[in-house]
Amino acid sequence: MFIKVNTKYFIDQYALQAQNQKLRSRSWFKLQSIDRLDKLLKQGMTVIDLGSTPGGWSSYVIKQISNLGTIVSCDILPMKKIAGVKFLQGDCSNINFLNEIDLKIKHKRAQVVLSDMSPNTTGISTVDVCKSIYLGKIALNMCCRFLAPGGSFLVKIFQGDGFDQYLYNLKCLFHKVKVRKPSSSRSHSREVYIVSKDFKYKRINI
C-alpha cells in the first residue's frame, strides 16, 4: 500500500519547528542536517557566511564555534543583530566589500565558507539557474581569497545548465565533493547543497 505524503504539510513542520524554537528561519535545519552528516563546524573556527539574512545559518554557526571562534556574516540585505556574529551589509562581488571582510577576520583565513545566497527568482528555470550559478561563482571566488588550505565550502546551487561545469570546478579545487539534498528542502525545488572539503588552495578566478 502506498501512502501519499502531503508535501506542503511536511515542509510546514520545519517552519513550525523554527517558530516554536524561535529560530530565524527553517534554513537552520538544512545546515544542521548537513553539518551532522559532514561535520563542517567545530569550536574556535573562523567562518564566513554569505547570503546570511535573516540569520538562520549564522545563529546555528555561532552555537557550534562558540565565543572561541569568529563568524563574519554578509548579505546585500540588512540583518538583525545576533550576539557574537559580525555582520557586514554589502555586495560580495565588490572588491571594497571584500577588503572589509578581510579586516573583520583580521587578515586571517577562514576554515569554512558557507553560501546560502539565492537569486530573486523569475519562475523561468533557465534564468533562475543562470543567476544561481553566477552567485555560486562569486562564492567560489571568495573561497580562493579567504579559505584556508584544507578548509570546507558549502554552497546552495540550482541544478540545470552550468551545474556540471560548476561541480567540475569544485572537484579541481577540493579533494572531496558531495551533493546533498536536505529533507527540509522542497522535493520539487532545483536547489541542492554542495559540500566541498579539503581545499587545495589555488588563487584563481572561476
From Swiss-Prot:
Q: What class of enzyme is it?
A: transferase
Keyword Transferase among UniProt keywords: yes
> What is the name of the gene encoding this protein?
rlmE
Identify one Gene Ontology CC term for this UniProt entry: cytoplasm
Keyword Zinc-finger included in the entry's annotation? no
Provide the reaction this enzyme catalyses. Answer: uridine(2552) in 23S rRNA + S-adenosyl-L-methionine = 2'-O-methyluridine(2552) in 23S rRNA + S-adenosyl-L-homocysteine + H(+)
Q: Where is the active site?
A: K156
UniProt lineage: Bacteria, Pseudomonadati, Pseudomonadota, Gammaproteobacteria, Enterobacterales
Q: Which family does it belong to?
A: Belongs to the class I-like SAM-binding methyltransferase superfamily. RNA methyltransferase RlmE family.
Function noted in UniProt = Specifically methylates the uridine in position 2552 of 23S rRNA at the 2'-O position of the ribose in the fully assembled 50S ribosomal subunit.
Name by which UniProt lists this protein: Ribosomal RNA large subunit methyltransferase E
UniProt-annotated location(s):
Cytoplasm
| Molecular-function GO term, any one | rRNA (uridine-2'-O-)-methyltransferase activity
Q: What is its EC number?
A: 2.1.1.166
Query: Which residues hold S-adenosyl-L-methionine?
Result: G55, W57, D75, D91, D116
The main location class comes to: cytoplasm
Entry keyword set: Cytoplasm, Methyltransferase, rRNA processing, S-adenosyl-L-methionine, Transferase
